[in-house]
Regions:
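Surface-exposed molecular-recognition determinants
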Residues: 1-155
């Protein structure tokens, strides 16, 4: 799955079919995004932070250290991971469903830590850091929860 969404687009839609059992190796999804709220099949998600690793831009974690990648874990199988080339955290406002994120050292979850990502993202954006490419790669087979369709919409 490959997709390009221009930064600053009034509205952009991306629908990705995520098979309930597994997805092929090396499937890639590329998006260019701006900070905002996204709508998924399981509810509304907030974009809390990412980095364009190709240009060297980074988002700092809550400890202040730069992160060049993270892992996304399925809510029904934390042992499986997706390698992420750029930072992304999607979480519903009520925090009832989210893609957990893993740094090089520890797992992050909960509203406070995720809010810190958003704060850092806005600070970096205000400082003029170019954040224009989000790229994450699915490696290997990955089991997903019941919502096998992920619909992302720029609002």
């Amino acid at each position: 799955i490959d997709a390009q969404v221009p930064v600053g687009a009034k509205q952009a839609r991306l629908t990705a079919m995520l098979y309930p059992t597994s997805i092929p190796t090396a499937v890639s999804l590329f998006m260019s995004v701006a900070p905002g709220v996204f709508r998924g099949t399981a509810g509304d998600y907030n974009l809390y932070g990412f980095a364009n690793t190709a240009s060297g831009a980074t988002i700092t974690n809550v400890n202040g250290s730069p992160m060049s990648y993270m892992h996304l874990a399925s809510p029904n199988n934390a042992g499986q991971a997706i390698h992420v080339d750029a930072l992304l955290t999607l979480v519903r406002p009520d925090a009832s469903h989210f893609f957990g994120c893993k740094s090089t050292t520890s797992y992050f979850s909960g509203g406070d830590l995720l809010h810190a990502y958003y704060t850092n993202f806005m600070q970096n954006a205000a400082a003029g850091v170019a954040l224009n490419i989000l790229a994450f790669r699915f490696a290997g087979s990955f089991p997903w929860a019941a919502d096998s369709y992920l619909h992302v919409e720029w609002l």
